[in-house]
Design a protein with these regions (language model features):
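Glycine-centered coil/turn sites that cap beta-strands in beta-rich domains
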Residues: 656-689, 703, 708-711
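C-terminal tail/sorting-segment detector
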Residues: 727-748
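Surface-exposed loops/turns
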Residues: 67, 722-723
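Bacterial Sec-dependent N-terminal signal peptides
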Residues: 1-17
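Short, glycine-anchored, charge-dense loop/turn motifs used at functional sites
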Residues: 687-698, 726
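Glycine-centered tight-turn motifs at strand-turn-strand junctions
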Residues: 697-721, 732-736
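Terminal processing/anchoring signals of secreted or surface-associated proteins
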Residues: 12, 651-655, 664-667, 679, ...
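Carboxylate-rich, polar loop motifs that coordinate divalent cations or form catalytic acidic clusters
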Residues: 12-662, 697, 729
Length: 748
């Protein structure tokens, strides 16, 4: 039978392509593009809000940004583009006409100062003045180069941060962390501190603005006016911290944490109360419409009266993905923190839409804004939390909480109600195994499908028969014989102490036959590369793999750890001394390690590095990879970082059970091409033959064990084939199954 299947939209994402998800909530800057749109810079990238239809378009590094942490933004009406400043000191210009980014990196290479964040821009003709954390830089637009850096202003210390810059009345004026400084534009040597007149202000100057012929400065103590003699307080203006300033032809807008104050040209004030405690920047259009960049709500649009419209792009609450896991429905869950300290919520991605969770109630303890581990059982998604116990979400997102008040779970020694469940794993019988951290006894729990919860670890039977009382359980995995591999720490939860392997011998209700063995860095006790084990995974061949503070290790035969002598772990030589935070194993049995230096991909046997992904050679959001999750059904690899979630589409898709229909894409296949043709729908270890219309064998493509193979359009001699019709014939490893599909090749 001939199956001719062309590429549906389902396969629009090609193997090797990336997608990034970031939070657009924490806004740093805002700029108005004429009258049609507002641009917002955030610590997750850039977005454009169309004021006419409400449409939001987002930009990350994949769409052309140099990086995602934006710190400054200015619309250049003369060039119809955006000047974008980044935390790193990089500066980009985004031309709106052709949507092209030009990036200038000179300031990132300044080594004299540690902080190089861009704070503000001021455009004047061919000059762009750039306020930075170490001073003021002059960029000549036509020459596309930085001409000078000014780092000393009058009596202020060298490298004082500049928060804003303004040119008015023949003066170059800078707002700094120590106060205000000004110099004449006619000066021939602005690098000389003596050319600058400085005015110290306690708390510094936050922003500058000009209204008519008057120059104003925002300070921690209210609004200041700059005169020939210096700075003086604006009469009648309240003495409070002014965060930001903006102007129209008539009005000056001053933003404080509790109100927006409008100063008219005649000096009168109009005050509008509001909660602006998280606001950071302010912009207005020609009609006086106000737009505020906010740390929590992203963009606030102030309407008539007291109306405030909140514009928040659909995105996760935070860019911190300390945890990333996938449930049985293919939904992606991320958590801002492993622990409760510093937690900023957790989030779930389903069908391209994010749902955020924070401050969920847990009776008897503080609200929960994170999770530490996740498993699925039936229609239920079960989350272990740091302090809140166990959270169960059903298919309708109804929440059930199990904690100290209604279950056997025990809190930490200092607080019985603070139940820490940092790791969950589910066995083939549907039993959810749970690590209970920092408890005085019974650090292992089994949550049965019938709802019962059993405790393990403390039996009084002595060494080797119970969990070591001087250790606490942090992370848990299950091997092919249902033994539990538990990464442990010292009794106080601070120091890594290796792994405890627990065997219940298949008798959940009889602890008398339970066995425990400790594996650590000692000879004949496993010889781990480091006792701090950060992740444990079972590979496709039954071996146990570890990610530690000092490299990777594996036990080829996990059963051997209960022998007379514990065999030494095998090490991955190329990852020695590498801090490894996380681990995932794909359908091709490759090992993917997260680290502080990006992602490492190791061969199935651990003998070679196949690939490495960093911010320098890929769209990976950050080299600080905290967690990795893998979806076997789609081949997607998810990398949780401190700057968001990166997704790589890989060829490692779980193979089909039976070989029936093949899908070919792209079809027709135009060669030469930068992309490859994909044959999809294979069983494990299938072989694909490319055959010409006359029956000649053109190429053999062995499967690596996954659902698809790729063809570059070349024959066995490395030459591109001619235009015409070809067939892809797939044969199972045992030769009992086969499938065929037609390929149209167009050679250009």
């Amino acid at each position: 039978m001939l199956f001719l299947l062309f590429a549906p939209a389902l396969f629009a994402q090609r193997v090797g392509t990336w997608k990034n998800y970031t939070s657009f909530r924490n806004a740093s800057s805002v700029a108005v593009e004429a009258q049609c749109a507002v641009w917002v810079g955030t610590d997750g990238g850039l977005y454009r809000f169309n004021r006419e239809n409400g449409e939001i378009r987002t930009f990350t590094n994949i769409e052309g940004l140099f990086e995602t942490r934006i710190s400054a933004l200015t619309y250049d009406s003369g060039r119809d583009g955006l000047w974008i400043g980044y935390e790193s000191g990089a500066v980009s210009f985004f031309a709106l006409s052709d949507e092209r980014f030009s990036t200038f990196l000179e300031l990132t290479r300044v080594t004299q100062f540690a902080n190089r964040t861009i704070r503000k821009f001021f455009v004047r003709g061919d000059s762009l003045y750039v306020a930075t954390d170490f001073g003021l830089s002059l960029f000549v637009v036509s020459r596309r180069e930085f001409r000078e850096n000014y780092i000393r202003f009058g009596t202020f210390a060298s490298g004082t941060a500049v928060c804003d810059v303004l040119i008015a009345q023949g003066q170059l004026i800078v707002a700094t962390a120590l106060g205000l400084a000004r110099a004449s534009l006619r000066s021939t040597n602005l690098n000389a501190p003596t050319e600058w007149q400085s005015f110290a202000v306690s708390g510094g100057i936050n922003a500058l603005a000009i209204q008519g012929e008057e120059i104003f400065a925002a300070s921690a103590d209210g609004l200041l006016r700059l005169s020939r003699s210096g700075l003086e307080r604006e009469s009648g203006f309240p003495q409070k911290n002014v965060i930001a300033l903006a102007t129209t032809s008539n009005d000056l807008f001053a933003l404080a944490s509790d109100e927006l104050i409008v100063r008219r040209r005649d000096g009168s004030l109009v005050r509008r109360a509001g909660n602006f405690s998280q606001s950071r920047a302010l912009a207005s259009d020609a009609d006086g419409q106000i737009f505020i960049a906010d740390r929590r709500q992203s963009l606030l649009v102030l309407g008539a009266g007291t109306t405030v419209t909140v514009i928040t792009p659909n995105s996760p609450l935070s860019n911190s993905f300390e945890i990333v896991q996938i449930d049985a429905f293919g939904r992606v869950w991320g958590s801002s923190s492993l622990r409760n300290g510093g937690a900023q919520g957790f989030y779930r991605l389903e069908n391209g839409v994010w749902r955020n969770f924070e401050n969920l109630p847990s009776p008897g303890t503080a609200p929960v804004s994170q999770f530490s581990s996740l498993v699925s059982r039936g229609n239920t998604t079960i989350l272990g939390t740091w302090g809140g116990g166990l959270f169960e979400f059903d298919a309708r997102d109804s929440l059930r909480v199990l904690n100290r008040s209604n279950s056997p779970f025990v809190g930490i020694r200092q607080s019985e109600s603070f139940v820490v469940l940092p790791s969950l794993a589910i066995d083939q019988q549907g039993v959810v195994w749970i690590a209970n951290f920092l408890t005085a006894q019974n650090p292992i729990y089994a949550y049965l499908p019938n709802g019962n919860i059993l405790r393990f670890g403390t039996s009084g039977l002595g060494p080797g028969r119970e969990f070591p009382s001087n250790l606490t359980a942090l992370r848990l995995a299950i091997d092919g014989n249902n033994r539990k591999w538990i990464a442990v720490q010292s009794e106080d939860g601070v120091t890594g102490r290796g792994i405890v392997v627990f065997d219940d011998n298949g008798t959940l209700t009889d602890v008398r036959d339970d066995r425990y063995v400790l594996i650590d860095e000692r000879q004949n006790f496993g010889r781990l590369p480091h006792p701090k084990v950060n992740d444990i995974q079972l590979d496709n061949d039954g071996s146990i793999w570890l990610a530690t503070d000092r490299g990777a290790a594996y036990f080829f035969n996990p059963d051997a750890v209960f022998g007379l002598r514990i065999p030494n772990a095998s090490l991955v030589f190329d990852l020695r001394n590498e801090f490894l935070s996380s681990l995932a194993i794909d359908a091709l049995n490759r090992k993917w390690f997260g680290s502080q230096n990006g992602v490492w991909v190791v061969s199935a046997g651990g003998d070679s590095i196949l690939m490495r992904f960093t911010t320098e050679n890929s769209p990976l959001l950050s080299n600080n990879v905290r967690s990795i999750a893998y979806d076997r059904k789609t081949g997607k690899m998810y990398f949780g970082t401190d700057r968001g979630l990166s997704v790589l589409y890989t060829e490692a898709i779980e193979p089909q059970e039976t070989l029936s229909a093949l899908t070919i894409y792209p079809n027709p296949f135009r060669i030469p091409a930068s992309t490859r043709l994909v044959v999809d729908g294979l069983v494990r270890q299938a072989l694909v033959r490319i055959i010409s219309l006359s029956g000649t064998l053109v190429r053999e493509l062995p499967s690596s064990g996954g659902r698809l193979v790729e063809w570059d359009g070349k024959d066995r001699n490395g030459n591109y084939v001619s235009s015409g019709i070809y067939f892809a014939v797939a044969i199972s490893e045992d030769g009992r199954q086969s499938a065929i599909a037609k390929i149209a090749v167009i050679r250009r």
